[in-house]
């Protein structure tokens, strides 16, 4: 079966009025703030209005360790949400807003795909309601206020050598990673080395995703630490008197965006922290609203279960107080074959032809990664469901191999064809998810707030990643000691590492053993509410490839966007 392009499917979808989409969730028109015809903001008044409704079954979609191509988590999230409606359930989907950086880079857009996508996909991938721009503006206002403070006398005694706050932009631009500002003489500022990160890596984005209300966002923005004084005291956005103006910029951005799928299932799109260099989950407020509107809320966590799902459990759920009922692990034939170590998958290039040949033994050779990621879900007391995301090049024997591994591990499993068939292609998956979500589970956090920061890092490294231990660069060790002394030790930990391996080395596939996690730097995201450990060579500002997706994107003679994928 040949499936049209995602853009063609998106444009062929019969969109329903957003009032009808909202009505599926019991949201009245008074709670909607339309942005054009196909997107609306949802008022935060909905949180209070819906507080007496029962809580939805809460399902998180994660994956095995992916290839650079991605394994279809967003597509599976949307397909599952649609399939639950086929079973007569009221369902809602919650996903992150895509960053325009990867949209114009190698990865392309992030609306799902085929007959399981968020539509219109052009709106989702390009600007949407401007939340990304609000985050960028609020972040850079704080940068400007900080530099202005230095220029106007430095009343707070900020140490220019201990400034941790950079600037952000929603573009992949490697030339901005390291820059010098303030050149040109005294009238043009104070020269210092700094740089740009991508907006999705901004702490302001993480604050947006983890805030529970407008007032909570105001408090969190005020707590952002931008650097330290000469005596080692933290300097905050509140100290710089920037937090109020930042909140004013973000006042509309805190409201989730309502869209729909190709089958008119409601979707809440909100916030977009990256899954490898941030905590990688959509917003708490979107889940708080959708969780009171539906029988089932299906949300997505970035990259593999060791990344986005671990942070979903230990950062997002710790903050929101919501408790998941089931977790879906997306597995693909190609990813498991890649984990066999017999093939190399490169972003932007076709798969090796020999990788497409029927070979269930190669699938089984990479199955240790699936086994470990099932275990990572179980560590948190949640029932795992393996979703085999089917591709046209797969073979039945290869699906059977994945099913056999999942069943050996005691996990439910279903083969899903939601890309080519929409919700009806994910009915088996929806049925086993309902079974898993309706059985009792004992959700638990991986570590208590009271554990020290080293213990938290080492718990994640050894129990989730499979490391033998952790090594710390001297600067990282000093930072941990300083953060404990300042009073930041009770915060959870977000570990930034490659998403292409359970380890910090992207070349180590499967479920590697006999390795040590190297922590080279530790930062404090106090506004967001976590400590941020950086392992290996992580880039907080991506670059463009040799042939970025931007080269293919244009408008036609009718003003329609072409080339977006």
Curated annotation (Swiss-Prot):
The record's SUPFAM superfamilies line, in alphabetical order, gives: P-loop containing nucleoside triphosphate hydrolases (SSF52540)
What InterPro entries has UniProt attached to this entry?
Formate_THF_ligase, Formate_THF_ligase_CS, P-loop_NTPase
Broad class of enzyme this protein falls into: ligase
Q: Which Gene3D superfamilies match?
A: Domain 2, N(10)-formyltetrahydrofolate synthetase, Formyltetrahydrofolate synthetase, domain 3, P-loop containing nucleotide triphosphate hydrolases
Instruction: Tell me the pathway.
Output: One-carbon metabolism; tetrahydrofolate interconversion
Binding annotation for ATP = 67-74
> What catalytic activity is recorded?
(6S)-5,6,7,8-tetrahydrofolate + formate + ATP = (6R)-10-formyltetrahydrofolate + ADP + phosphate
For this entry, list what GO says about its biological process. tetrahydrofolate interconversion
Question: Which Pfam family, just one, is annotated for this protein?
Answer: FTHFS
* EC number(s) from the headed UniProt entry: 6.3.4.3
Give the record's keywords alphabetically: ATP-binding, Ligase, Nucleotide-binding, One-carbon metabolism
Q: Which GO terms describe its molecular function?
A: ATP binding; formate-tetrahydrofolate ligase activity
Query: Which CDD domains does the record associate with it?
Result: FTHFS
- Could you tell me the superkingdom of the organism this chain comes from? Bacteria
Q: What NCBIfam families does the entry give?
A: PRK13505.1 (NF010030)
Annotated family: Belongs to the formate--tetrahydrofolate ligase family.
State the name under which the record lists this protein: Formate--tetrahydrofolate ligase
Q: Which organism is it from?
A: Saccharopolyspora erythraea (strain ATCC 11635 / DSM 40517 / JCM 4748 / NBRC 13426 / NCIMB 8594 / NRRL 2338)
What gene name does this entry carry? fhs
């Amino acid at each position: 079966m040949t499936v049209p392009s995602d853009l063609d499917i998106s444009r062929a979808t019969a969109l329903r009025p957003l009032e009808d989409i909202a009505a599926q969730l019991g949201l009245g028109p008074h709670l909607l703030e339309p942005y054009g015809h196909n997107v609306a903001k949802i008022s935060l008044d909905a949180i209070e209005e819906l507080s007496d409704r029962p809580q939805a079954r809460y399902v998180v979609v994660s994956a095995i360790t992916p290839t650079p191509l991605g394994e279809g988590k967003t597509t599976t999230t949307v397909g599952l949400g649609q399939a639950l409606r086929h079973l007569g359930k009221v369902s809602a989907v919650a996903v992150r807003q895509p960053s325009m950086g990867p949209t114009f880079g190698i990865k392309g857009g992030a609306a799902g795909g085929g007959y399981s996508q968020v539509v219109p996909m052009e709106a989702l991938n390009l600007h949407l309601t401007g939340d990304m721009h609000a985050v960028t503006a609020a972040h850079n206002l704080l940068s400007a206020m900080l530099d202005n403070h230095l220029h106007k006398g430095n009343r707070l005694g900020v140490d220019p050598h201990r400034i941790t706050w950079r600037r952000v932009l929603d573009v992949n631009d490697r030339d901005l990673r390291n820059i010098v500002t303030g050149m040109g003489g005294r009238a043009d500022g104070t020269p210092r080395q700094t740089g740009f990160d991508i907006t999705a890596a901004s702490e302001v984005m993480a604050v947006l995703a983890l805030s529970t209300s407008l007032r909570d966002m105001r408090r969190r923005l005020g707590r952002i630490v931008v650097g330290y004084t000469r005596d080692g005291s933290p300097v905050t956005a509140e100290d710089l008197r920037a937090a109020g103006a930042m909140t004013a910029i973000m006042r509309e951005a805190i409201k989730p965006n309502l869209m729909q799928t190709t089958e008119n299932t409601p979707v809440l799109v909100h916030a977009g922290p990256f899954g490898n260099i941030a905590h990688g989950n959509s917003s708490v407020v979107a889940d708080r609203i959708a969780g009171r509107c539906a029988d089932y809320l299906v949300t997505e966590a970035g990259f593999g279960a060791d990344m986005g799902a671990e942070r979903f459990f230990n950062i997002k759920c710790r903050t929101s107080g919501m408790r998941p009922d089931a977790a879906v692990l997306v597995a693909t034939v190609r990813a498991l074959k890649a984990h066999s170590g017999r093939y190399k998958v490169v972003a932007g290039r076709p798969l090796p032809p020999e990788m497409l040949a029927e070979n269930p033994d190669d699938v089984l050779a990479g199955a240790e990664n699936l086994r470990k990621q099932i275990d990572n879900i179980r560590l948190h007391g949640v029932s795992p469901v393996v979703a085999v995301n089917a591709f046209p090049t797969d073979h039945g024997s290869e699906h059977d191999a994945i099913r056999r591994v999942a069943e050996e591990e005691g996990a439910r499993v279903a083969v899903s064809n939601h890309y080519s068939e929409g919700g009806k292609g994910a009915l088996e998956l929806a049925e086993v998810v309902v079974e898993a979500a309706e059985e009792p589970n004992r959700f638990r956090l991986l570590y208590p707030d009271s554990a020290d920061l080293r213990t938290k890092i080492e718990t994640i490294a050894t129990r989730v990643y499979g490391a033998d231990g952790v090594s710390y660069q001297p600067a990282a060790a000093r930072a941990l000691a300083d953060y404990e002394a300042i009073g930041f030790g009770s915060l959870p930990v977000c570990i930034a590492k490659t998403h292409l391996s359970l380890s910090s080395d992207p070349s180590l596939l499967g479920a590697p053993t006999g390795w040590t996690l190297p922590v080279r730097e530790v930062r404090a995201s106090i506004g967001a509410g976590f400590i941020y450990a950086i392992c290996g060579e992580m880039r907080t500002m991506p670059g463009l490839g040799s042939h970025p997706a931007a080269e293919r994107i244009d408008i036609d003679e009718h003003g329609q966007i072409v080339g977006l994928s």
